[in-house]
């Protein structure tokens, strides 16, 4: 069932759906509240996290200090929101429900920057020539550099089945092709 990023987490938490696959990075909070699968390959999309800014501000925002006092958007309940909060301590984190809305907020001047996974940033910039990727990037810890599938806490049988499928996909070297196809579709 298609739903928004933050809504899908709530649906798993309440048991409305058995699991969610939505590019989730591992976080301590998620590990405490959900069953999380083994990591699966997410390409450069998770290993690098970036800030989108208006092209006209490319020289203005080159370090975290430059964003002090500025509104910086990130998707609700995302790794990017965690990174904005932890690494842009002088900025004002603004919760965005959807990346597309975040891009509109950035372009209209309601926020000064938008935190997104690097792969997403590249696709957004390709479609929006008035935006650029900030030269400064977030420092991403190794445990955040891959994705996990989220299940309701206690669903260990489902977790075991999902992990077995992920192991088979890894063994068959399927991730690279899937990732390439997903990027092309994006």
Question: Which residue stretches match the model-derived regions?
Answer:
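Extracytoplasmic small-molecule ligand-binding "clamshell" domains
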Residues: 1-23
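Short beta-strand-to-loop elements that line the ligand-binding cleft
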Residues: 1-4, 74, 91-98, 105
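Short, hydrophobic alpha-helical packing/hinge segments within bilobed ligand-binding/sensory domains
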Residues: 7-12, 102-105, 111, 120-121
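Hydrophobic residues within well-ordered alpha-helices
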Residues: 12-13, 67, 106-107, 149, ...
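A ligand-binding cleft/hinge motif common to bilobed small-molecule-binding domains
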Residues: 22-33, 83-86, 112-143
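Periplasmic-binding protein-like
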Residues: 42-55, 122-166, 185-186
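Flexible hinge/capping segments at coil-to-helix
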Residues: 53-71
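Ligand-binding clefts/hinges and TM-proximal coupling segments of bilobed small-molecule sensing domains
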Residues: 79-89, 132-138, 161-186
């Amino acid at each position: 069932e298609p739903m928004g990023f933050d809504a899908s987490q709530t649906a798993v938490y309440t048991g409305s759906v058995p699991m969610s696959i939505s590019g989730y990075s591992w976080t301590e909070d998620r590990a405490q509240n959900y069953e999380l699968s083994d990591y699966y390959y997410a390409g450069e999309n998770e290993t690098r996290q970036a800030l989108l800014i208006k092209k006209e501000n490319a020289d203005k925002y080159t370090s975290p200090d430059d964003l002090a006092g500025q509104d910086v958007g990130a998707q609700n309940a995302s790794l990017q929101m965690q990174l904005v909060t932890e690494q842009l301590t002088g900025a004002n984190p603004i919760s965005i429900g959807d990346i597309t809305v975040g891009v509109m907020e950035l372009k209209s001047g309601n926020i000064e920057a938008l935190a997104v996974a690097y792969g997403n940033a590249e696709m957004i910039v390709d479609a929006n020539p008035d935006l650029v990727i900030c030269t400064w990037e977030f420092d991403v810890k190794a445990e955040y550099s891959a994705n996990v599938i989220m299940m309701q806490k206690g669903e260990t049988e489902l977790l075991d089945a999902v992990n077995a499928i992920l192991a088979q996909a890894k063994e068959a070297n399927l991730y690279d092709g899937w990732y390439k196809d997903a990027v092309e579709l994006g």
